[in-house]
């Protein structure tokens, strides 16, 4: 990081990328493990299959591949990237996975760090990164969302094991002194409701030295109160988006695409209905990938760009929500 450019007033979006593992876990295969069925899962979640990491598909590798394709779309020299922010709750290294991605990319001039906010993580990382760029300290950044929640699922719990998959997505963002394509944003946290969705540490006491308790580090599987999380999402997400529309003087009619965290198709449809956004404007790929946590939003955006759905100057309303409980919204113009 070098000097500060006080002329930088906004950000523009230059590229997107994504990666999912090859291994596919269908609803039919899950029904061989727990008491469920393809029809039951599909009708309640909208999910048909999800991608599951095999050896080599860790967050470092998935995040690297997503970032690389975003950089290629942006047509950047890797040496000009000066900031990498990785949103993840499942780092391959508990001390942080972003530095490993930086090294693998060869982005020697980039500062790299992780940010943890679960399913809101990518949106929080996008907003945080944009503020760094607007502050004039950085010029080009990669924001990555990557998670490997399959490693933390109780595969005997049919309420939660049907939901999650693995993957990564990334956006390439550049500072500009002419306009700001991050039109507006808002973020919220309510720790009082944190027990509705968590992945708590599980400390086992080891006797290593007499009269001293040593706690070995481990994590319990994902714990979720699905009914409460659903009620939280369908209530809070429309509220925060409506407030954002009012703050930015936009209306839902001016939105080209609604991109929500891909948790459940019923949540996506309910939020769209509350905002009076037609179903054809709601982007969804959870049928193929399930809930990939911090990866869902950039993964949806990248697929929509590469299929020529999202185009230059399209207005995208997006919201992430999940464990914390945390949630947020952003209004962006692509390009």
From Swiss-Prot:
Locations listed in the record: Cytoplasm
Coiled-coil intervals, chain numbering: none
A Pfam match: ACP_syn_III_C
Keywords of this entry: Acyltransferase, Cytoplasm, Fatty acid biosynthesis, Fatty acid metabolism, Lipid biosynthesis, Lipid metabolism, Multifunctional enzyme, Transferase
Gene Ontology terms describing biological process: fatty acid biosynthetic process
UniProt subunit comment: Homodimer.
GO MF, any single term: 3-oxoacyl-[acyl-carrier-protein] synthase activity
Protein name: Beta-ketoacyl-[acyl-carrier-protein] synthase III
Domains as described in the record: The last Arg residue of the ACP-binding site is essential for the weak association between ACP/AcpP and FabH.
Classification of source organism: Bacteria, Bacillati, Cyanobacteriota, Cyanophyceae, Synechococcales
CDD domains assigned to the protein according to its UniProt record, in alphabetical order: KAS_III
Name of the top EC class for this enzyme: transferase
Annotated organism of origin: Prochlorococcus marinus (strain MIT 9301)
Pathway(s): Lipid metabolism; fatty acid biosynthesis
Catalysed reactions, semicolon-separated: malonyl-[ACP] + acetyl-CoA + H(+) = 3-oxobutanoyl-[ACP] + CO2 + CoA
UniProt similarity note: Belongs to the thiolase-like superfamily. FabH family.
GO cellular component terms given for this protein: cytoplasm
Active site, UniProt feature: 119, 261, 291
Annotated EC: 2.3.1.180
Major location (coarse): cytoplasm
Region (ACP-binding): 262-266
Task performed by this protein: Catalyzes the condensation reaction of fatty acid synthesis by the addition to an acyl acceptor of two carbons from malonyl-ACP. Catalyzes the first condensation reaction which initiates fatty acid synthesis and may therefore play a role in governing the total rate of fatty acid production. Possesses both acetoacetyl-ACP synthase and acetyl transacylase activities. Its substrate specificity determines the biosynthesis of branched-chain and/or straight-chain of fatty acids.
